[in-house]
Amino acid sequence: MKKKRLLSLLLGGAVPFPVAAGGGQETVPTDQTAPPPAPYPASEPAPNEELKNQLIIGTVTQMESEFYDTSFSAAGTNYIMYDLIHGYDTVISTKEGAFEYDPTVVASHEEVDNEDGSRTYTVTINDGLVWSDGTPITAKDYVFAVLLQSSPEMAEIGYPSQTGYSLVGYDEFFNGTTENFAGVRLIDDMTYSVTVKASELPDHFDIAFGGIRPRPMHVIAPDADVVDSEAGASITGEFTSELLETTVNDPETGYRANPQVVCGPYLFDSFDVSAQEAVLKINPQYAGDYRGVKPTIETVIVRLVSSDTMMNELEAGNVDLLSQVSGGETVEAGLDLADEGVVNYSSYYRNGYGKIQFDCSQFPTDSANVRQAIAYCLDRNEFVRQYTGGYGAVAHSFYGLAQWEYQDSIDWINENLNTYEMNVESAIELLEADGWTLGEDGQPYSGEGVRYKEVDGQLRPLVIEWAASEDNPVADLLATMLPANMEAAGMQLNTTTMDFTTLYSSISHSSDKIYNMYNLGTGIPVQNNLWYFYSKDPVWMQAGYNANWIADDELDAAAWAMKSIPYDDNETWLNSWREFIKVWNEKLPDIPLYSDEYFDFYNPKVQNWEASDAIWPWSRAVLDASIG
């Protein structure tokens, strides 16, 4: 029987849902994106796909040749695959959303508060863990990871080098004034310690300070070593940016594009950029996750599919699983297949939202009035009705339906947040208050054409540059609903359609042209470090963290007020969270469009499939699943 739609969600607000708890932010192109090159017709199975113990996952998010971490790319599908390839983090989040030391990895740990207000985390690694090539994993690999990813050498090849940002001695090490990282110590072959700055404490997610993901020093810097001294740990031997350009950045053999030695549940086998297909193979050396669970599916293939044809691909057997499916028409097509017994499905609420993301460093979207005016030009209720088909709700701030904070705040949200109901007159009032009162000739605005404003003695037009995802139903719907009202308010919307890789380079300010707005989706991580996502500190101004490039005193203060709240103080956290989303709702670095119900549709041969959004994504669910 077809699942009943969440029609009550469309009444402008919300209904309570089962609680789910909720790092850098995941970035996806509003859930649906460009079609693949379609190497296999939907009516024909792809070659070699008669193999039984493999899982083909269809994704609508374009993949990049990036398999290192979110600091190089926070693209949605790559973001999830990192956890399949890499592993043995000392601190993990459980299936219940709690943080703990991973007993598969950690033999013992100790936290000591120092007299100067700093805190030292000492962690001993279990014997017997090995890299996929059989090389033993030791504390050196963990210390190397911190030194590598905090180093000026890594920064020179395009990595932000922020891993050790919160640790004592980071500034001196990153600036190159010392080769020793004072807050990082190699205690013995299996033990390391890190000391957190007093200024970073207390922290809501303080256990995470003890967490490190190892990196294979023998691959990335084979002629280097990690040594310890009273001044802190350091890297000796050959370790230069020129070396890292080869071992990390080489597009064919570097660790970013081709990580051949890993310690996660799966090995990186291949990635075909043109076919948009990644192949992962089971890692026989993997010791298991925090529960000791190891995968049984031999091969995982991740393949780009089109939102228009992906249900046909699933029905034909060209893919086995479609994860995080959204959009009313697509969901209905999947539920029809379920009614026919062709597929099984599960659903869960989203820990994130679809959005228009603003770049707040660019004129004229550096003005909150302009951002709010654009919001007033869009009928978001109608947008949600058309796009989600009853499986979603309008969001009004930085939250998703799955968050417990949202579920405990439904009435409060409806009473306290601006819903930005479509009102072109309100948009005009905001623009006039912001100084957009002139025409092209410098005379008072006549009510026709584009508004102008005098800035530093020059007339500037009210032109918004939109980087839109290609072949994207969200972008298509926005293109039918937004331009006319913006024009009526005196704004000009210029649309440039592009693939996700090009779009992402603009978001990260690594391309020649930076746009004012993008249609995207965001996943809110379990470790929801809002104080970094909206920090004024330039170190966090980057894709994956403060991707809005917003430097606002009130928003920064509201986010940082949450940092020191103890992890178990839910009442104080909730009150501060409400204050934060209220300030966010006023500053509006994004226009939240919708948060919705995600569906996973899969072939009945896929057994024990149990995923949720941020807490237990498909990269975790794969470990429990089997092919039967």
Locate the predicted segments by residue.
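Short, low-complexity disordered leader/linker segments with a strong preference
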Residues: 1-52, 115, 438-456, 626-628
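N-terminal lobe/hinge region of extracytoplasmic solute-binding protein
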Residues: 55-116
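Gly/Pro-rich hinge or "lid" segments in bacterial periplasmic/extracellular proteins
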Residues: 95-96, 210-292, 299, 429
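Aromatic- and charge-enriched surface segment that lines or borders ligand/interaction sites
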Residues: 107-163, 187, 193, 313, ...
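Surface-exposed binding/hinge segments that line
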Residues: 159-243
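Ligand-site clamp/hinge motif
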Residues: 252-257, 285-333, 483, 492
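Append "and occasionally in soluble cytosolic enzymes with long acidic Gly/Pro-rich linkers
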Residues: 281, 366-483, 579
